[in-house]
């Protein structure tokens, strides 16, 4: 029987049978993998820890006729702080939905995996704004997938005067006020938002989250990211709507 040893993070789980669990793993070696974790829901199972949602583990998988079976798993990072906090878990669930849609079976996506893990680490271990972490994740994910918008200058004339920029969803990048013409769907953005977008798209992964923005700029990033993502991925992600419900409860 063939086996595969790979690190990966659980991005989806479905209970099956009396005590089994089918998990979807975002793996380093094979992209998306579906695997059966037999008995993983039993409290004393050696698989119970490493097969939980958001657990990043080292897996040994046996390849069966229809899917892999989990033979063993050793936890590398459990992201317990996220799973134990409803608000953080909601942000993480939003990112998991996106990841589950864009990765493919037998298609390694190491840069996307690193982005996802870094985003979860920031969400779990720092006091950075969860919403900013998510917006950075969304924009950088699209860029990594090949949908990077042109955000270093006006896509038409090359102007770098960021205080008069619009984000064109038709042109997939910046247009200055002189080149805007009849692009009625373009979104006027501030200099701060323009610089933030440029940073997110072009910065090194190690420095991706090392900046802060005002609430108004974060709101602009959200408007760009949500619409750009909806048009490129052809889906409207709604899990973050639950955050508004939580905010109302807190008030």
Swiss-Prot record:
GO biological process, one term: double-strand break repair
Coiled-coil blocks: none
Swiss-Prot/TrEMBL keywords: DNA damage, DNA recombination, DNA repair
Domain of life of the organism encoding this protein: Bacteria
CC annotations in GO: bacterial nucleoid
Gene3D superfamilies on file: Nucleic acid-binding proteins, Recombination protein O, C-terminal domain, Recombination protein O, zinc-binding domain
Pfam families the UniProt entry points to: RecO_C, RecO_N
Annotated InterPro entries: ARFGAP/RecO, DNA_rep/recomb_RecO_N, NA-bd_OB-fold, RecO, RecO_C
HAMAP family associated with the record: RecO
UniProt record similarity statement: Belongs to the RecO family.
Role of this protein: Involved in DNA repair and RecF pathway recombination.
Protein name: DNA repair protein RecO
Lineage: Bacteria, Bacillati, Bacillota, Clostridia, Eubacteriales
Recorded name of the encoding gene: recO
């Amino acid at each position: 029987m063939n086996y595969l040893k790979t690190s990966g993070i659980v991005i989806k789980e479905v209970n099956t049978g009396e005590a089994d669990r089918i998990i979807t793993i975002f793996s380093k070696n094979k992209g998306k993998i579906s695997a059966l974790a037999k008995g993983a829901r039993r409290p004393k199972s050696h698989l119970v820890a490493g097969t939980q949602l958001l657990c990043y583990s080292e897996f040994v998988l046996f390849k069966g006729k229809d899917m892999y079976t989990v033979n063993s798993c050793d936890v590398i990072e459990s992201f317990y702080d996220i799973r134990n906090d409803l608000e953080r878990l909601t942000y993480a669930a939003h990112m998991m939905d996106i990841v589950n849609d864009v990765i493919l079976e037998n298609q390694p996506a190491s840069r996307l995996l690193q982005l996802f893990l870094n985003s979860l680490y920031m969400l779990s271990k720092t006091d950075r704004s969860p919403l900013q972490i998510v917006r950075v994740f969304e924009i950088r994910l699209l860029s990594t997938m090949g949908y990077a918008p042109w955000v270093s200058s006006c896509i038409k004339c090359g102007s770098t005067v960021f205080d008069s920029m619009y984000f064109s969803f038709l042109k997939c990048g910046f247009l200055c006020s002189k080149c805007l013409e009849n692009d009625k769907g373009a979104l006027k953005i501030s200099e701060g938002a323009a610089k933030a977008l440029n940073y997110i798209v072009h910065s090194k992964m190690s420095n991706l989250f090392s900046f802060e923005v005002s609430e108004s700029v974060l709101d602009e990033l959200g408007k760009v990211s949500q619409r750009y993502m909806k048009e490129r991925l052809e889906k409207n992600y709604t899990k973050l709507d639950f955050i508004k419900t939580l905010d109302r409860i807190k008030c």
